[in-house]
Design a protein with these regions (language model features):
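Phosphate-end processing signature that detects enzymes handling 5′-triphosphorylated RNA
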Residues: 1-149
């Protein structure tokens, strides 16, 4: 189960420098968007992911892929290949902020995601102003939607 909230922060308003934190290079594409079936390269790891419908709460299953399988599936994606840098910033309460800085045609889009252990925690989270607009309930900011723009 994936329980997350999404925000649109302004990079100039962040109280930290993303470059001070670990960064992963992510490339992903969608074989299907309803339901979501995604392939992803995360640094040197490769995955096939299924995600159910939903906004804040969705079922998610990740299966490892070989690089060869990933490269075989990559030409079969619908829409654009998404490329982004992901910075992981620790937050209070054992939470982590995943800051995605999109590249190429989706630049300068920045999306911040925070995963929660349960819905109650997600709903109770008081977002600091620097996180910007809460777009959790907007399907427009799902990567599967962005792949079609």
């Amino acid at each position: 189960m994936e329980i997350e909230r999404k925000f649109l922060p302004d990079l100039n308003s962040l109280p930290f420098n993303p470059e001070d934190y670990p960064c992963r290079k992510i490339e992903q594409g969608y074989l299907c968007t309803s339901p979501v079936v995604r392939i992803r390269r995360d640094n040197k790891s490769f995955f096939l992911t299924y995600k159910s419908k939903g906004l804040m709460v969705r079922e998610e299953y990740n299966l490892p892929l070989t690089q060869e399988a990933y490269e075989h599936l990559k030409p079969k994606i619908d829409g654009r290949l998404i490329q982004k840098k992901r910075y992981v910033i620790p937050l209070d309460g054992g939470l982590a902020l995943e800051l995605d800085i999109f590249e190429d045609s989706l630049a300068p889009l920045v999306i911040a995601e925070i995963e929660f252990p349960d819905e109650e925690s997600a709903n109770a989270f008081m977002a600091p102003a620097w996180l910007g607009e809460d777009v959790t309930m907007s399907p427009l900011y799902h990567n599967s939607t962005l792949s079609k723009i």
